[in-house]
Every structure is written in C-alpha cells, then in structure tokens.
UniProtKB/Swiss-Prot annotation:
Protein name: Hemoglobin subunit alpha
GO molecular function: haptoglobin binding; heme binding; iron ion binding; organic acid binding; oxygen binding; oxygen carrier activity; peroxidase activity
Gene Ontology BP terms: hydrogen peroxide catabolic process
The protein's role, per its UniProt record: Involved in oxygen transport from the lung to the various peripheral tissues. Has antimicrobial activity against B.subtilis ATCC 6633. Has antioxidant activity.
Origin: domain of life: Eukaryota
Phylogenetic lineage: Eukaryota, Metazoa, Chordata, Craniata, Vertebrata
Family of this protein: Belongs to the globin family.
InterPro entries found in the cross-reference section: Globin, Globin-like_sf, Globin/Proto, Hemoglobin_a-typ, Hemoglobin_oxygen_transport, Hemoglobin_pi
Length: 141
C-alpha cells in the first residue's frame, strides 16, 4: 500500500520524468531487452536495434501508461484496467516481465535524475512500480 509520503515522492520525481516519456521509455525497453533477452519474444515484429522507431514508439506508450498511473495514483486498478486485460488475455505476457521492466525504469530514472532519487524516493517509486505490476497481473487470476 502506498502511503501519502510515497504518493508525494512518486509525483515529485515523475514531474522530472514527464517531459521525457519517449526517450526514457525507449531506454527502459532497450535495457530490458539487453538484461532480460527472453523478453524479446513478445516483440518478434519489432526492429530491436538501438533507437529504432518501434522501440521509441512503444517506450512512449509504456511511459505514457505510467504517467496515467501517476495521475490516478489513488485508483491504479481503474487507470490500468484496459492494459491489464490486454496483457493478460490478448498478449499473454508472462507476469515476471513487468518486474523486469520496473527494474529498468528505476535504473533509467536513477541515471537521469540521480539527485532526485534519494533512498526514500527510490523506495516509493519501487513500491509504486510494484503496485502497477500487481494491477497489470490482476486479470491473470
């Protein structure tokens, strides 16, 4: 459960991320594909090379969804319901992949905003990403 402090921390750091959704999203996906190559199986039709238009576009979608989740941090299930159904029923993404991506999101934020990612903010952002992952996997049950 996200505390009020967690929510404030997430919103504060996300303000710095919000202007870079495509750039950071693409970077997070590229990191995930490199660190967890098994995740590439969900993107057989993508050009997975560095900076590809497909990775940039999908990275922007991913970070736009996270942006939407931040904007609706008090109702993550409502904000992410459609994506949860899509990933569970249509795309059939293995739930562990959300954790892999969350790890890469944390790394990207840490690289670009090291001064903002204090231990407390890091913990809050991690809790938020875990909550998002939990909601995205809720339709699997």
């Amino acid at each position: 459960v996200l505390s009020s402090d967690d929510k404030c921390n997430v919103k504060a750091v996300w303000c710095k991320v919000a202007g870079h959704l495509e750039e950071y999203g693409a970077e997070a996906l590229e990191r995930m594909f490199c660190a967890y190559p098994q995740t590439k199986i969900y993107f057989p039709h993508f050009d997975l090379s560095h900076g590809s238009a497909q990775i940039r576009a999908h990275g922007k979608k991913v970070f736009a969804a996270l942006h939407e989740a931040v904007n609706h941090i008090d109702d993550l299930p409502g904000a992410l319901c459609r994506l949860s159904e899509l990933h569970a029923h249509s795309l059939r993404v293995d739930p562990v992949n959300f954790k892999f991506l969350a790890q890469c999101v944390l790394v990207v934020v840490a690289i670009h905003h090291p001064g903002s990612l204090t231990p407390e903010v890091h913990a809050s952002l991690d809790k938020f990403l875990c909550a998002v992952s939990s909601v995205l996997t809720s339709k699997y049950r």
